[in-house]
Curated annotation (Swiss-Prot):
Catalytic activity line of the entry: L-cysteine + L-glutamate + ATP = gamma-L-glutamyl-L-cysteine + ADP + phosphate + H(+)
Gene Ontology biological process terms from the UniProt entry: glutathione biosynthetic process
Residues making up the signal peptide according to the UniProt record: none
Cellular component terms per the entry's GO annotation: cytosol
NCBIfam families xref list: glu_cys_ligase
Involved pathway(s): Sulfur metabolism; glutathione biosynthesis; glutathione from L-cysteine and L-glutamate: step 1/2
Gene (name only): gshA
Domain of life of the organism encoding this protein: Bacteria
A Pfam entry, by short name: Glu_cys_ligase
Protein name: Glutamate--cysteine ligase
Organism from which the protein derives: Shigella flexneri serotype 5b (strain 8401)
Membrane-spanning residues: none
Entry-linked InterPro entries: Gln_synth/guanido_kin_cat_dom, Glu_cys_ligase, Glut_cys_ligase
Family, similarity comment: Belongs to the glutamate--cysteine ligase type 1 family. Type 1 subfamily.
Keyword tags: ATP-binding, Glutathione biosynthesis, Ligase, Nucleotide-binding
Amino acid sequence: MIPDVSQALAWLEKHPQALKGIQRGLERETLRVNADGTLATTGHPEALGSALTHKWITTDFAEALLEFITPVDGDIEHMLTFMRDLHRYTARNMGDERMWPLSMPCYIAEGQDIELAQYGTSNTGRFKTLYREGLKNRYGALMQTISGVHYNFSLPMAFWQAKCGDISGADAKEKISAGYFRVIRNYYRFGWVIPYLFGASPAICSSFLQGKPTSLPFEKTECGMYYLPYATSLRLSDLGYTNKSQSNLGITFNDLYEYVAGLKQAIKTPSEEYAKIGIEKDGKRLQINSNVLQIENELYAPIRPKRVTRSGESPSDALLRGGIEYIEVRSLDINPFSPIGVDEQQVRFLDLFMVWCALADAPEMSSSELACTRVNWNRVILEGRKPGLTLGIGCETAQFPLLQVGKDLFRDLKRVAQTLDSINGGEAYQKVCDELVACFDNPDLTFSARILRSMIDTGIGGTGKAFAEAYRNLLREEPLEILREEDFVAEREASERRQQEMETADTEPFAVWLEKHA
């Protein structure tokens, strides 16, 4: 089932320097909660400055949903330490609140009033809050409080030059974009390995079912927790963060212009369903527009092609201008075993897997083939640890044991690991391969199995509160390592100044400004 990558691996072993200079970045979301696990109702902590303009700490959907962002980094340890500093400083500056250590929230009732993230009075800030109002009215606020980790990854120019010859200008844009689309297609085919290893949401609180009947064979504990015994990541299931109305958009990942055209079409396509919500009610705007996507970011995807945008530029226009610059992997649950929600083992695994995805052959995929890849993902998400589980290839009927496919993949990853270790020194990548490949013979080693044992004992709430408390105490005590207190103070002041400048510069009334941007 795994494509034959032997030639590409042999090529890589002859050109190990092509992997020198991999760049990455991390984003981690987490809910601020009270000691009893309920959602914090306070505003964004003052010490963290302006969520609109802060370089490292912002908010996602809700005012209580923090998001930490590391700068682009070539050094894994430095990046993780930077992320830990952001957590340390925040833990010391949020009073008695703490960070929820799980992807799935617990003590939130459906219909509970969840305050949307607030960004001040500038048109840009108000637009961001209105977008969130639209998300709430379309999908419900509960779904939007699910949190995850995003891993951003780019291969060095040396890799593309070794692979594609001496490229520059428009030629480089085309070839590098084609290379990243290959990564994305392979990710759709084989990325289910991520929830298999690292999925950490095998259970949900009853509020997530919202009283609706479900065909899933949930088991229920006395404290009202629902779980599937072999599930890995319900966050990635239809109960979690997904969007059914987008499934027939037909966006494909074969060609830059085709992809962008599909995305641009979706933000212009009216939706009958969302038209029913209305645009305005009693003088209050309910969504930016009633199209399938209000803006491009609403497209739900487990992986995204990205380029850093210039001021006022849409994500798709940035891609058209310069091609794909990096990839954003969006399928990681919060790692409950790390105080910062992600660890070195995961980052090293993703490095290996991304390189493998760039090497393995990846035939073009139609939108129907893309839909077929969802079958494997769903199997792994809902019953990934089930003994004897099999997976298919695309829309074909042949089935292969997950256990064997996983081991075959790791045989390749081990060779990538040897190459990366040869240029970085040490055996860190090979060690990660040895640790993780054991999860196929022993699914009890996976994150989902480990966290489920705790959840069955003490419930999602009990587990979340215990981890949150332990991490709060740990992070508050740890000294900063890279950033200093004064760096945070300076960034707080600079971010508040930037927000103020934006608000002062806006002379156009929001309603007028919105007409141009909706």
